[in-house]
Amino acid sequence: MTHPTELPLSPLSALQFYATAPYPCSYLDGRIARSQVATPSHLINSDIYTELVKAGFRRSGVFTYRPYCDGCRACVPVRVPVRAFTPSRTQRRMWKRHRALVATVSPLHYDEEHYALYMRYQSARHAGGGMDRDSRDQYEQFLLQSRINSRLVEFRDLDASGGEPGKLRMVSMIDILGDGLSSVYTFFEPDDAHTSYGTYNILWQIEQARSLGLPYVYLGYWIRESPKMAYKANFHPLEGLLDGRWKTLDPARVDLPPVDAALARAPLPGGHSGAG
């Protein structure tokens, strides 16, 4: 276990960091990935997690990690500077289209309707990826376990009758950091075609950060070669963490070191490759 030299000694000096064994990359087919994990998880409070996010870490439940892959630097942590953000014409259109959705912010909690939407989303968008078979316990471990300042946001249609809540359209989990909001995960109604709910959700988070006086919205990792991550490049300006520094990012021009194909496609222990 080591302390990465690029991380400040305080308040992270109480943490330890280790590298995982290689595993198949979930973003790029045929690639092998590794992660660097921050432990122990019970010491990672909101202040410490803010510093970790600024150093490129993310979380899945109480598991805090960042990419640590041999021969590959495709994952670039990105964030939107709230004050400088200017929506595109398409984004303004999406904002206007969905502005009637009612957003309700609450502490993390289990809701059967949320889980049902999650399963529909996974089955439609990520069939065969494993998450489309998540049990309720796995769903809770992935999205509802947190030791930091986290919130669940549900988006529903406005119910004109004033009776029952309107139809659930989207659920989003966010972390509230010292310097911004961090988008954890979002799922939405997959049967609604061409809605761009994901884009609207980020626009909503940017507006929330602005109202809270927070300078950034962290979007996780942008991967140029991954179509699933391409939408993040549509928010301007965008900052990326490159060589340990946050810089304004031009996705069309960013100079990433070439992937070492021999390392990135190395076989997993036991002779299994990362393909498939």
From Swiss-Prot:
**Tell me, which GO biological process terms does this entry list?**
ubiquitin-dependent protein catabolic process via the N-end rule pathway
What are this entry's molecular-function GO terms? Answer: arginyl-tRNA--protein transferase activity; leucyl-tRNA--protein transferase activity
UniProt keyword Transmembrane, yes or no? no
What are the EC numbers?
Answer: 2.3.2.29
Q: Does this UniProt record's set of keywords contain Acyltransferase?
A: yes
> Which cellular compartments is it found in?
Cytoplasm
Alphabetically ordered keywords of this record? Acyltransferase, Cytoplasm, Transferase
Q: Which reaction does it catalyse?
A: N-terminal L-glutamyl-[protein] + L-leucyl-tRNA(Leu) = N-terminal L-leucyl-L-glutamyl-[protein] + tRNA(Leu) + H(+); N-terminal L-aspartyl-[protein] + L-leucyl-tRNA(Leu) = N-terminal L-leucyl-L-aspartyl-[protein] + tRNA(Leu) + H(+)
EC class, as a word, reads transferase
According to its UniProt record, where is this protein mainly located? cytoplasm
What Gene Ontology terms describe where this protein resides (cellular component)?
Answer: cytoplasm
Function summary: Functions in the N-end rule pathway of protein degradation where it conjugates Leu from its aminoacyl-tRNA to the N-termini of proteins containing an N-terminal aspartate or glutamate.
Q: Which family does it belong to?
A: Belongs to the R-transferase family. Bpt subfamily.
HAMAP family in the cross-refs = Bpt
Supply the name of the protein. Answer: Aspartate/glutamate leucyltransferase
Gene name for this UniProt entry: bpt
